[in-house]
Amino acid sequence: MARSFITKDANGNPAIRKPRGGEQMYRGTPRYCSMAAHQRRDQGRVDDLWGWLHTLVELHCGLPWRNERDEARVAKMKGEMAPEKLCERCPAEFLPIHKYLTILKYESRPDYFAIYTHLLEGIRRCKSSFMYPYEWEDSPREVETALSISENSITTKKPATKVHMARRMYPQARSEYFKENALGF
């Protein structure tokens, strides 16, 4: 199901694997996959992000093609769907991510920090927090209790603050982590 996109060049240095020509084996779920998958082209990092974005839209408001079973019709709907229409009932931050993905190519290294920043803007705009409980959590105190016990037993007997617990549970990524490019791609 997966294929390495990094190989070695003639000198033995890491290089991005060139996309294979011709029709490729279909990998994916029609509802979530990228247009490259529908078109049987080789897939890169951007195609993973298309699957991720389609999943977010599905979870938030449902994809327009969610009831369609025919792959060709799903591909046609995706190809004809304006980004504004797809994202109209989604958080405002989804649209710039969608538009950004449309400019990426197979070999492109996505700007993950920009995507992350858009998502954080949405969290801030909604005045939300990583510490808010999910709907399925019985009590907002469950997470705090679990983290406090863990935190106190490992480091100190002082109770952990909400901010400290949030950092432990959901560390805020710093831009240098996203910009770090250990493989050079």
Q: PLM features: residue spans?
A:
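Extended, low-complexity, intrinsically disordered C-terminal regulatory tails
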Residues: 70, 79-89, 113-117, 124-185
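Conserved end of the kinase activation segment
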Residues: 35-47
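C-terminal lobe of the eukaryotic/viral protein kinase catalytic domain
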Residues: 51, 61-106
